[in-house]
Swiss-Prot record:
CDD domains: cPLA2_Fungal_PLB. A lipid is attached at N680 (GPI-anchor amidated asparagine). The gene is PLB2. It is found in: Secreted, Cell wall; Membrane. Glycans are attached at residues 47, 80, 94, 125, 162, 181, 193, 217, 279, 309, 365, 390, 491, 515, 524, 543, 567, 584, 598, 630, 634, 642, 648, 652, 658. This is Lysophospholipase 2. Optimum pH is 4. The lineage of its organism: Eukaryota, Fungi, Dikarya, Ascomycota, Saccharomycotina. Belongs to the lysophospholipase family.
Amino acid sequence: MQLRNILQASSLISGLSLAADSSSTTGDGYAPSIIPCPSDDTSLVRNASGLSTAETDWLKKRDAYTKEALHSFLSRATSNFSDTSLLSTLFSSNSSNVPKIGIACSGGGYRAMLGGAGMIAAMDNRTDGANEHGLGGLLQSSTYLSGLSGGNWLTGTLAWNNWTSVQEIVDHMSESDSIWNITKSIVNPGGSNLTYTIERWESIVQEVQAKSDAGFNISLSDLWARALSYNFFPSLPDAGSALTWSSLRDVDVFKNGEMPLPITVADGRYPGTTVINLNATLFEFTPFEMGSWDPSLNAFTDVKYLGTNVTNGKPVNKDQCVSGYDNAGFVIATSASLFNEFSLEASTSTYYKMINSFANKYVNNLSQDDDDIAIYAANPFKDTEFVDRNYTSSIVDADDLFLVDGGEDGQNLPLVPLIKKERDLDVVFALDISDNTDESWPSGVCMTNTYERQYSKQGKGMAFPYVPDVNTFLNLGLTNKPTFFGCDAKNLTDLEYIPPLVVYIPNTKHSFNGNQSTLKMNYNVTERLGMIRNGFEAATMGNFTDDSNFLGCIGCAIIRRKQESLNATLPPECTKCFADYCWNGTLSTSANPELSGNSTYQSGAIASAISEATDGIPITALLGSSTSGNTTSNSTTSTSSNVTSNSNSSSNTTLNSNSSSSSISSSTARSSSSTANKANAAAISYANTNTLMSLLGAITALFGLI
């Protein structure tokens, strides 16, 4: 991989702003505001009977860019082919012959964000060396880019920073205010500079409290959203507190079709339930809409007006629509909101109780019944009439909409939005950086789960290529290199429709140990660069050193569906590629030892992650003891006894200081005395802030399970 300054990040381009243009922000901060409703009497909700008018119109602009970019990419990919006449047919005046591409980025915390960044960099012609040693131009040729959980941290960062590139992020990586500066965890961003950390968390608490004071329900996901935003939008005022999801449609690079359409995925949770499975309602967010194709909802709403009180899509009060509820950080955090799963896991329930107690201590009016999920209130689909008659109407009957991490249903790859017949894609690149095995490598289970979903109630009208069981994935080495699924359309005719060919690209080791724990919540510059470089190599078969023909094989995968539908002659080089990379239906179902038991949820691993993320104070001591010194009259000096009694944390578990790591520049810090005054004004003491930091360490470690 030849990312500029990949090993010498000290050579930087100064003064270049990566933030989105000024049109990307609305309102005055994180709290939503009230605005007049649209003047026309149209509903804010539509039946999910096809693509929205806005998406359809945007596609016309995007198609013009992808056609040119894809022609250039395929010309390079097939330059050594004996017969390239098919390209002339594909790029004739008939635009329907041009293949359409989607890219899906899996969840997996910072591992997925960084490893996925390397894979995306390999596909981006803005990356130095990507055209010579990678798949440069493939990203420019793609129509859709979906992200889930940690993968959405990647896609959201790129899209809402004015479609910045991984290359630009790398070029600025050693700067203290750079994007993805995660040398210190979001829990303690100042490291040894406690002043900096206190001020950061004062701001976060005040911003979330402002949303509550404005009359909107809040949950732990709001705190998570604001904390994450400092990693993703550091160049924007208050780290993008006023940045909205819908504002992207007003940014030129998106409005003109110069970038893919970003899609993020979250799972719905029925009111009064906690279990999420393949029958969960799958929600997608685009800059235009949010909603679900699933029969349990079958509706979409304009994302710009989320939070508005509606009945069957019509505002209850035409003079009072909500603006700013679709905060970009909140949507990104929604896709990574995994709190409810912790309350179900025996090994994490104690930490969850700690978090619940902490959050209610510092933020007033936190939802008591549903603080473990992302709350969208009022429910934008209240009383809508598009639910399939065979389904319960509980989602549309509820006053609020509850969403959780998009991977909780076992589909850790956001493939469903890309395989919809309405989007008519020919090939989907599935970038899997999950941690399913004992060694934190992907097992292919997310592919298996998406395949199985088409046979569930929620999978009505869905099609996905045949894939093997998880043991076969591992036993046949399908997770050791890219594998193509659905290579022959003639073998898929018994499905609902012919789905896209899926190019599965798993996380594999090349130059760096890319199988970092999902619980790892801080990466220094060297680690970040190593993860990105390894992702680049995983996506390119080691910069083509493992297979010099790999670029051509990717070209074959892209043109395959159109070649079949046109009944055109397949280049002979593609025949060999498909023999090398297509799964041929062979099964090997014997139990694989790599699946003996993933340790993600073990309490020891969580405690270890907390110790890395916070400064060295035992959690049990903090929970059980009174605070002292620098306190204010409004400070709560101890936690409730039921939390302490339920804790099974060892008093010997300490939270080690990581102050030796590089920290945010001290030039931004204020004196301790001025900070103490500010802390008193905000009713947050130094001692309580230490408690806050430690308990937020528990939050961070648990969130790391995505």
